[in-house]
């Protein structure tokens, strides 16, 4: 009626844009009805799970069609919310001694892994900003969820743990990681603020260097795009590396389930590959063990030399054999290396950890 009235009186629509949406159905796709007893009240969800979980669910659905809502669906959404919240907690927890004014590392001096993380952040940032402009909130939801659970939790932060926990507090390696984490944190909290507004505000108030920022995340601008992070060469290189790591991760999980190993750091792996895969492996030979989260890693360019029980990629172009590493375990970093006990002042630790302990005056 408002459309007809406005057109008749003013000759134009009373709004710039209009969105259409479907109905909210129950978990089985049936129309909600009090007589049937399948009505899910939003206030009940908010009371049980919190407003941010409700808002996150709303952002996750494609509202242009009918959407389903049930306690089971919301419970699943609360698990997703918890993963996002835990990502924020982990980032904040590892920035306790980081001052962005004095400790930040220049982009060109950062570790390549950290620059890859910023590349992924930039891609997610652009996806989310466009999704908001297009009112496609479910695109924003999936981009953030995937970034937190896959790019950060399963890859970046998993590899980063060793650097964060074993390196000297003010080392370049650790500060490089913290610089990337700080950029990720301050960007991500603004990207999700329109949806999980209460959680975003909670994170904002806990940020390092908080006094120099807007008093509320909801008063801050969205993060600006940064073309420098969009490194196509780096993207292609890490696409190949992560594909290989995925094969190793599956092989390690299979070995763990078969009780061949207990923890990945108990493993010694040999990766068999040729052609382009072999070139990728050789380019990262020095950091391969750390990248795959194992104690020792070897490379073979002869696929036919792989043992029969070696784990093979789906296309058979990469094979991984896993054995228990018999080297002594460093009590500080848990890696099994040949240089454990090499420093008489620091027993039962590897040479790297002994060096760090010496630098720390211990």
Language-model regions, residue ranges each:
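Metal-dependent nuclease catalytic cores in nucleic-acid-processing enzymes
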Residues: 1-11, 250, 255
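Short linker/helix segments within small regulatory modules
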Residues: 339-348
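Core structural elements
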Residues: 79-92, 112-124, 142-164
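Cys/His-rich metal-chelating microdomains
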Residues: 336-339, 356
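Acidic, turn-prone loop/beta-hairpin segments
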Residues: 98-126, 157-251, 255-275, 279, ...
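Catalytic adenosine-cofactor/nucleotide-binding cores of aminoacyl-tRNA synthetases and other
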Residues: 23-28, 32-110, 208-213, 258-263, ...
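Short cysteine-rich clusters marking metal-coordination/redox-active sites
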Residues: 330, 350-353
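Short alpha-helical scaffolding segments that buttress acidic/His motifs in well-ordered protein cores
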Residues: 2, 18, 53-60, 85-91, ...
């Amino acid at each position: 009626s408002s459309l007809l009235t406005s057109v008749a009186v003013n000759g134009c629509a009373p709004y710039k844009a209009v969105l259409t949406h479907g109905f909210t159905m129950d978990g089985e796709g049936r129309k909600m009805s009090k007589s049937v007893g399948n009505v899910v009240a939003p206030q009940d969800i908010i009371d049980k799970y919190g407003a941010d979980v409700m808002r996150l669910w709303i952002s996750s659905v494609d509202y242009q069609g009918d959407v389903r809502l049930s306690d089971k669906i919301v419970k699943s959404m609360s698990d997703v919310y918890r993963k996002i919240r835990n990502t924020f907690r982990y980032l904040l927890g590892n920035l306790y001694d980081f001052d962005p004014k004095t400790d930040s590392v220049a982009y060109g001096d950062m570790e390549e892994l950290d620059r890859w993380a910023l590349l992924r952040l930039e891609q997610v940032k652009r996806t989310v900003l466009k999704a908001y402009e297009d009112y496609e909130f479910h695109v924003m939801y999936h981009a953030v969820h995937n970034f937190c659970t896959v790019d950060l939790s399963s890859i970046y932060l998993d590899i980063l743990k060793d650097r964060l926990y074993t390196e000297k507090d003010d080392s370049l390696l650790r500060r490089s990681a913290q610089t990337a984490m700080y950029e990720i944190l301050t960007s991500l909290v603004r990207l999700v603020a329109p949806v999980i507004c209460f959680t975003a505000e909670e994170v904002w108030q806990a940020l390092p260097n908080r006094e120099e920022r807007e008093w509320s995340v909801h008063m801050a601008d969205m993060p600006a795009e940064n073309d420098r992070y969009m490194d196509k060469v780096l993207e292609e290189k890490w696409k190949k590396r992560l594909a290989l790591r995925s094969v190793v991760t599956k092989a390690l999980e299979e070995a763990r389930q078969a009780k061949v190993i207990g923890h990945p750091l108990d493993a010694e792996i040999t990766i068999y590959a040729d052609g382009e895969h072999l070139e990728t492996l050789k380019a990262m030979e020095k950091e391969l063990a750390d990248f795959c989260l194992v104690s020792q890693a070897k490379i073979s360019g002869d696929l036919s030399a792989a043992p029969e029980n070696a784990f093979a990629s789906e296309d058979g172009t990469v094979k991984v054999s896993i054995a228990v590493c018999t080297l002594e375990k460093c009590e500080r970093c848990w890696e099994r290396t040949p240089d454990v006990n090499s420093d008489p002042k620091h027993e039962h630790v590897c040479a790297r950890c002994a060096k760090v302990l010496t630098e720390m005056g211990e």
